[in-house]
Amino acid sequence: MTKNAPTASVITRLSPAKINLFLHITGKRADGYHNLQTVFRLLDWGDYLHFSVANKPMATIDSAVDNSAVDINSLCGQLLTLDGAEAITSSIEDNLIFKAARTLLAAAIDSSKLPEHLPKVLVTLDKHLPMGAGLGGGSSNAATTLLVLNEIWQLNFNQETLIKIGAKIGADVPIFIFGQDAIATGIGEQLTAIDLPDQQYLVLTPNAHVNTAKLFAHPKLPRDITLLSIETIKNQYDNYVQTLIAPYHNVFTPVVTSLAPAVDEGLRYLQGLEKIALGTARMTGSGSTVFLPLDASVTDDKLLLSKWIEEAPCTAYVVRSL
């Protein structure tokens, strides 16, 4: 290595998946978005993001120029390089990792927190989660990017502010910044921590995708589920953690299974295992992933779990809650 060559340090972070233990739509807002109520659970399974931080050269912000005059897209393009085929969309501006960096820089400018010197960062995405599967993969990537760049660029935004920044990128981004199991309301940005028992899940990822906008517009989608109190949800966790008992359910399941046969097949497969697993199979988000909570009596039976994975109608995994 040349004596004066720039070196880089690497930060590697898990960008975890999430599942919804139940998912209700409680109404439609004036802005067209829907209010939701759900319990998010984070998993020890996900993508990995590697942030290579160059010690030099750095991008320099002209302190004589009003921050409001800074071209955010141009600055973000100077500071951030994406690597990994899955990280690159047809337009880099549409990539959620790039959007996260751009939104973070804009917030730094608005709050006069933009440093004069910023290190350049190469972000490498090691993709494991399927896209559009209800696991929050892209949102998790965006949240991980916000958290790590906030650290690298020494912007010193607190968690509450980062959650507000994340909500501008997507409704599922805040839970990954929150970083723990939570009851969510609003569009998913109003979060209350909840302590849940450790669990393992048999997760199936059918090769199916139903357009989210089409689902929200579907005439048979329930949009007026009664909003439950936070205290009720905390006290009734036995009704949705291992098994799923009314009123807890996923409003999208009947619609998605009617439109996507592969999801219906995966869910029926898991339902056939319920009596042994002692759990209720269900779908996460608006699909297409389905999962089955596993009772402790089966989690140590590796031969049985291997058999279930092998016989599944699509790709299957056994994963654990974070």
Curated annotation (Swiss-Prot):
The record's section on InterPro entries has: GHMP_kinase_C_sf, GHMP_kinase_N_dom, IspE, Ribosomal_Su5_D2-typ_SF, Ribsml_uS5_D2-typ_fold_subgr
Q: Name one GO biological process term.
A: terpenoid biosynthetic process
| Catalytic activity of the protein | 4-CDP-2-C-methyl-D-erythritol + ATP = 4-CDP-2-C-methyl-D-erythritol 2-phosphate + ADP + H(+)
**Catalytic-site annotation from UniProt:** K18, D172
UniProt-annotated binding residues for ATP: P130, M131, G132, A133, G134, L135, G136, G137, G138, S139, S140
Asked if the keyword Amino-acid biosynthesis belongs to this entry, the reply reads no
Which Pfam families does this one have? GHMP_kinases_N (PF00288)
Q: In which pathway does it act?
A: Isoprenoid biosynthesis; isopentenyl diphosphate biosynthesis via DXP pathway; isopentenyl diphosphate from 1-deoxy-D-xylulose 5-phosphate: step 3/6
**Keyword entries, A-Z:** ATP-binding, Isoprene biosynthesis, Kinase, Nucleotide-binding, Transferase
Q: Where is the signal peptide?
A: none
The role this protein plays is: Catalyzes the phosphorylation of the position 2 hydroxy group of 4-diphosphocytidyl-2C-methyl-D-erythritol.
Matching entries from NCBIfam families are given as: ispE
Entry's family note: Belongs to the GHMP kinase family. IspE subfamily.
Q: What protein name is recorded for this chain?
A: 4-diphosphocytidyl-2-C-methyl-D-erythritol kinase
Upper classification of the organism: Bacteria, Pseudomonadati, Pseudomonadota, Gammaproteobacteria, Moraxellales
Primary gene name: ispE
